[in-house]
C-alpha cells in the first residue's frame, strides 16, 4: 500500500493526513521554542552568569503587576477618603494642645481668673459695670454724710500735754465745758505732789462764767484771745483756732485785745 514503507512504518505523507493542521502548528511552535531556549542557553555572553534568571524574574514580576494593581484597587474602595470621613465625624474632638514646657494647673487657674475679671470689666454691653456703678452710687446716697471733724487743739494751765477737741461733735458751750472737764480732771490730779485717787479728783467748774478756779478762752483766726461763751455758738465755731484753759486770776493779762472786739461782736 501507499504510505507504508517497506519496513512497515508510516510515511510522513500519511502522518500529515492523519494529524490535523492545528495540532501540527502547535507541535512546530513548541518544537521551535524548545530549540530557541536551548540555543539561548548555549550562547556565549559577556555578562556574568545569572542574568538569564534575572530576566526571567523580571518577566514574572511584569506578569504579576496587573494582579497587584487589581488587589490595590479593591482595597482602595474599602479605605477610600469618603469612608474615613464618616468615621472621623463620629470621633470626639481632641483637647487643646498644651505647649512645652507644660503650664501647671494653678497657673492656668490664675490666668483664667485674671482673664475672666478683665472680661467682666470690659463687658459694658451686658451692663455689668453699669450695674456696679449704680450700686456704688446707691450705697453712697444711703450712707450718712460724714462731715470732716473740726479738731481744735486745747491746752490747760499746769498740764504739759495738750489735747484735741472735735467741735463738730458739740452743739453748745455746755457740752464743750463738760468735755474739757472730762479731759483734764485726771491730768490735774496727777500733777499734784501727793498721790491722788479717784475720790480726790475734783470737777472743773466755772469755765464759762469765770466763777471757778479756771476759765476757758480761745484764739481766733486773727490771733485775738477772747472768752468762750460771749459770742453765738456758730460764730465761735467758724472763727476759733485754739482753746486755752487759764487761771481766772490771769484773765486781765491774757485778754489784751479781746474786750473791745467782743463788745463790737455783741452789737
Curated annotation (Swiss-Prot):
GO molecular function, one term: DNA-binding transcription factor activity
Sequence motif EAR-like (transcriptional repression), location on chain: 42-46
Alphabetical list of SUPFAM superfamilies matching this protein: CAD & PB1 domains
Compartmental location: Nucleus
BP terms from Gene Ontology: auxin-activated signaling pathway; response to auxin
InterPro entries xref list: AUX/IAA_dom, AUX_IAA, PB1-like
Subunit structure: Homodimers and heterodimers. Interacts with TPL.
Protein name: Auxin-responsive protein IAA18
Amino acid at each position: 500500500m501507499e504510505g507504508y514503507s517497506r519496513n512497515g512504518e508510516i510515511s510522513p505523507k500519511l502522518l500529515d493526513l492523519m494529524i490535523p493542521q492545528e495540532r501540527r502548528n502547535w507541535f512546530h511552535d513548541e518544537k521551535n521554542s524548545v530549540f530557541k531556549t536551548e540555543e539561548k542557553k548555549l550562547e556565549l555572553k559577556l555578562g556574568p552568569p545569572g542574568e538569564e534568571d534575572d530576566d526571567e524574574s523580571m518577566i514574572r514580576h511584569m506578569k504579576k503587576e496587573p494582579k497587584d494593581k487589581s488587589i490595590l484597587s479593591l482595597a482602595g474602595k474599602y479605605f477610600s477618603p469618603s469612608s474615613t470621613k464618616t468615621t472621623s465625624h463620629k470621633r470626639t474632638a481632641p483637647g487643646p494642645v498644651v505647649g512645652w514646657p507644660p503650664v501647671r494647673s494653678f497657673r492656668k487657674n490664675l490666668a483664667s481668673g485674671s482673664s475672666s475679671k478683665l472680661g467682666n470689666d470690659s463687658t459694658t454691653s451686658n451692663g455689668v459695670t453699669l450695674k456696679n456703678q449704680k450700686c456704688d452710687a446707691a450705697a453712697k446716697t444711703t450712707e450718712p454724710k460724714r462731715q470732716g471733724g473740726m479738731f481744735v487743739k486745747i491746752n490747760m494751765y499746769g498740764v504739759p500735754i495738750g489735747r484735741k477737741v472735735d467741735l463738730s461733735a458739740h452743739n453748745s458751750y455746755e457740752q464743750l465745758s463738760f468735755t474739757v472737764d472730762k479731759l483734764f480732771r485726771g491730768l490735774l490730779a496727777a500733777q499734784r505732789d501727793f498721790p491722788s485717787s479717784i475720790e480726790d479728783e475734783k470737777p472743773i467748774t466755772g469755765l464759762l462764767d469765770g466763777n471757778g478756779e479756771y476759765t476757758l478762752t480761745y484764739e481766733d483766726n486773727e490771733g485775738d484771745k477772747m472768752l468762750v461763751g460771749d459770742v453765738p455758738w456758730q460764730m465761735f465755731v467758724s472763727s476759733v483756732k485754739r482753746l486755752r484753759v487759764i487761771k481766772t486770776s490771769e484773765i486781765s493779762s491774757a485778754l489784751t485785745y479781746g474786750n473791745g472786739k467782743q463788745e463790737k461782736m455783741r452789737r
